[in-house]
Amino acid sequence: MSRIGLKTIEVPDSVTVTKEGDNITVKGPKGELTRYFDPKITFEQNDGEINFSRSSESDKALHGTERANLASMIEGVLNGYKKTLKLIGVGYRAQAQGNKITLNVGYSHPVVLTAPEGVSVKATSATDVEVEGVSKQDVGQFAAEIRAVRPPEPYKGKGIRYVDEYVRRKEGKTGK
């Protein structure tokens, strides 16, 4: 049994959820999200609550997944999502201009990344980067792309990491 799929979702008054064909649209104070919703899973909306049901037992995993996706869409249009990254290393800098971020992280050239639509990026300081948006998927994906430019290395800890990330450190070679 899908325990997550059986949980109801509370929909606040400021959020509207509509289904048109196989797409589901969620509108809220921060924005609007549209996504494909599998027709094998049905949902009923009553008095600010959404309940999900599936057509067959083989759709258990899909049941929980679609419920979790809709819950994250509602959370996104209500509060938004934010990921913060930190650049650690001598001379590592970040500069944001509009929806582009320029990273100087030890390469011979600056690395320029463009944020996808619906995602904003800003450099709060020379070594801190914030990625914000309404889509959990887009925010997480763009933050992962920034981190992939220079992932943290285990010997000195240099690189780009999430603020809450723990980097396991290794010992260097022991000299004679």
From Swiss-Prot:
State the Gene Ontology terms under molecular function.
rRNA binding; structural constituent of ribosome
The protein's organism comes out as Lactobacillus acidophilus (strain ATCC 700396 / NCK56 / N2 / NCFM)
Q: Into which family does the record put it?
A: Belongs to the universal ribosomal protein uL6 family.
Q: What does this protein do?
A: This protein binds to the 23S rRNA, and is important in its secondary structure. It is located near the subunit interface in the base of the L7/L12 stalk, and near the tRNA binding site of the peptidyltransferase center.
List the InterPro entries.
Ribosomal_uL6-like, Ribosomal_uL6-like_a/b-dom_sf, Ribosomal_uL6_a/b-dom, Ribosomal_uL6_bac-type, Ribosomal_uL6_CS
| Keywords for this protein | Ribonucleoprotein, Ribosomal protein, RNA-binding, rRNA-binding
> Subunit info?
Part of the 50S ribosomal subunit.
Signal sequence annotation: none
**Swiss-Prot/TrEMBL GO biological process terms:** cytoplasmic translation
Q: Which Pfam families match?
A: Ribosomal_L6
GO terms under cellular component: cytosolic large ribosomal subunit
Mind telling me what this protein is named? Large ribosomal subunit protein uL6
**Which superkingdom?**
Bacteria
